[in-house]
């Protein structure tokens, strides 16, 4: 049996549809709510069929232990098949769940959600260190090698740093641009609603998703990305338009990093879990890993490019003249075994694309100077992606000792963005870094996601035996910076879509930046006789241009271009053919009910788009030029 135990502010459910194996229930069981409860998500497995009574006994014992720890007398039993791929028969599952309900009811207020029904549910996790626990129950007789009943933690590769993160004591403050540190409770956040949401999100540590954020519908409607049911949760499929947007973002970040002085490298996706150096680093990185077996070796899938780049640094001959030394990799993919309840759309994934740059510095002084430069670099990268300073909140995290020695550095970070920022300070260093920042995007559901980040690492040069030759010919350890100039590429797309959704609510017209728009110009001929001239216009434009040659009304064609967020829509009719000009609807300058239309020449439109996309990478149209030749992906 698998148990996922969530200490909840509340849990509520409502049945929607029964499956072929649904138990018969009374009307009272079709919905339920329990507050201040321990929610036990339960998957009864095939091994439990050998001794159901023993499985009940051991599961009840585990639930009681946790209930005592979190001090609650309310328990919700919730059948949740997704916890296991080796389920028991429905008959045994119902038997065990009812047995657990009966055993617990004498000492607790218990509710049980019905088995075999599709249900809508909402759970609010309290977010303290004991609020999310998993247990794996194996009754006697379940395996030949077992002589007695054993209760164990569910097998999962969890780093020591991640465990420490759950118990680390944080001091939360608001840092204002004037350099003052304020207690969170006493600071008026009313003028800063997004910062207020971010503070609440960070301090509560509640990451569970109650409903899909707006970008999920948008990524599907725009045919960018979708869930892939044939893969693990958090692994997405990208349609041609989505692949184009991803590719452009990847190329842009790599271009910026190489101009900044980074060398692009490529490293393996998997590493040996028992490699002594890597094992130590795993325990200092707050993440859950995918693990696999290969030729009797226990391997893990990388969650960043650190492993490969640091092993490469170890083998290099480096002079002080080479410092600062920068390397970058666009990791397609990095993998993190994020908890299932946190996965949603492009916001939090298990497989993602991360630009990961590392900088070897001569000493802490050089590291601090590089940190300043990379902070500004990250602001510039997001600005050019279309995510501005007012679109995200800044978090700065450090040890108290580092802050006392580097106050000016920290204060200048708040001055640069010219707004209050959230500070997290630790008395003890739990991780490999002494300072880090993130730019956090707060979405329409008040959930935050980190984008750009830079960290000062004081451990890994020693751990990986990385050294350089100083001016005196002696070996020295460098100080290391970790930098992701944009954050995960998928999160950039998520942030752009969420931003557009929020702007729509404000009465604005949503759109992607022109350089990222899959179709930059759509030409809409009014009738078949205008198609030839439409083709002539298309040839004069050096950008991603398509032609809507379908046999539809002009109104429908224009509306569909709007639903696809096409930045420039060109309508071709008799007047345009006679005057050799084009009627252009400019999306960026339009209102929701007031399209901005301008008469111009193809050459003028070409010059306008060239100026808007200057300095950005370009790729050709990802689909057929003529809409009549395109398949539908959704």
From Swiss-Prot:
Cellular compartments annotated: Cytoplasm
Cofactor (UniProt): Zn(2+)
UniProt entry keywords in alphabetical sequence: Aminoacyl-tRNA synthetase, ATP-binding, Cytoplasm, Ligase, Metal-binding, Nucleotide-binding, Protein biosynthesis, RNA-binding, tRNA-binding, Zinc
Reactions the enzyme catalyzes: tRNA(Thr) + L-threonine + ATP = L-threonyl-tRNA(Thr) + AMP + diphosphate + H(+)
GO MF: aminoacyl-tRNA deacylase activity; ATP binding; threonine-tRNA ligase activity; tRNA binding; zinc ion binding
UniProt-annotated stretches for the region Editing domain: 1-142
EC number: 6.1.1.3
Cofactor note: Binds 1 zinc ion per subunit.
Record SUPFAM superfamilies: Class II aaRS ABD-related, Class II aaRS and biotin synthetases
Gene Ontology BP annotations: threonyl-tRNA aminoacylation
InterPro entries: aa-tRNA-synt_IIb, aa-tRNA-synth_II, aa-tRNA-synth_II/BPL/LPL, Anticodon-bd, Anticodon-bd_dom_sf, DTD-like_sf, Thr-tRNA-ligase_IIa, Threonyl-tRNA_syn_edit_dom_arc
PROSITE patterns the UniProt entry points to: AA_TRNA_LIGASE_II (PS50862)
Cellular component terms (Gene Ontology): cytoplasm
Keyword Oxidoreductase attached: no
Cysteine disulfide partners in this protein: none
Residues the entry annotates as binding Zn(2+): 306, 358, 482
Region described as Catalytic: spans on this chain: 214-513
Enzyme class: ligase
UniProt KW Metal-binding keyword: yes
Notes on the domains: The N-terminal domain (approximately residues 1-142) is an archaea-specific tRNA-editing domain that hydrolyzes incorrectly charged L-seryl-tRNA(Thr). Catalysis of tRNA editing is performed by the charged tRNA itself.
Family under the similarity heading: Belongs to the class-II aminoacyl-tRNA synthetase family.
Function of the molecule: Catalyzes the attachment of threonine to tRNA(Thr) in a two-step reaction: L-threonine is first activated by ATP to form Thr-AMP and then transferred to the acceptor end of tRNA(Thr). Edits incorrectly charged L-seryl-tRNA(Thr) probably via its editing domain (tested with total bovine tRNA). Activates L-serine, but does not detectably transfer it to tRNA (tested with total bovine tRNA).
Assembly information from the UniProt record: Homodimer.
Protein name: Threonine--tRNA ligase
